[in-house]
Amino acid sequence: MKSLWIAIIITLITSQVVSARRKEPEDPNYPKDPNELIRTKWNAVISVLQNKEIDQEARIKKINKIVSPIFDFQLMAKLALGREHWPKLTKQQQEKFIQLFVERLRTSYREKIALYTNEEILFKPAEKKKSTINIPMELKTKDKKIAVLHKLRKVDKRWKVYDVEIQGVSILLTYRSQFDDILSRGTVEDLLSRLEEPPPQ
């Protein structure tokens, strides 16, 4: 069940591929409070997951529309690759890495979203940092509780998610360790080629 929720969260994160940050149009309905932002988006996603009258393709499209505005994809790509490696990439390589990285996550996990079975969500108050905010959440299944932590920062006056921890483990840092291993033995082009390969089953 833990792997299911990891799959759902990563599906949310990878719901839209972008190559570079661009200023977004004003949205008067975009929540200014980060607690409200996370709560509103999760409730909307759960509503879609619980709707058995729509097929999987329609479900994914609806989730894309709900959550795609709230993630800082450019920062997520930088953090996943790491400060040591990111500046070494050309602009073209950076854009390609973002696309391949997000597509890899999407391909690996989004099929599992269909396994959702009405687990309970408990939202918790935000933990304020100097320039960021952490918002914890607990997912209750029949036999366990799963701790989820959303990490947010402000981008163009909007709160955006830049990482998610599950049971204390950062999704981005997990990928960084894999990328570090590849780059320690090869080049950036080797990494991009690996990301173009189908993910292991």
What are these regions (language model features)?
Residues 86, 135, 161:
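Surface-exposed aromatic
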Residues 145-173:
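Short beta-strand edge/turn micro-motifs at domain boundaries
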Residues 101, 125-127, 139-141, 152-154, ...:
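A mature extracytoplasmic/lumenal domain signature
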Residues 20-26:
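Boundary of Sec targeting at the N-terminus
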Residues 28-109:
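Early exported N-terminus immediately downstream of N-terminal targeting peptides
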Residues 1-19:
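N-terminal export/membrane-targeting signals
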Residues 107-146, 198-201:
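Surface-exposed, charged secondary-structure patches
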Residues 163-201:
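Low-complexity, intrinsically disordered terminal/linker segments enriched in charged
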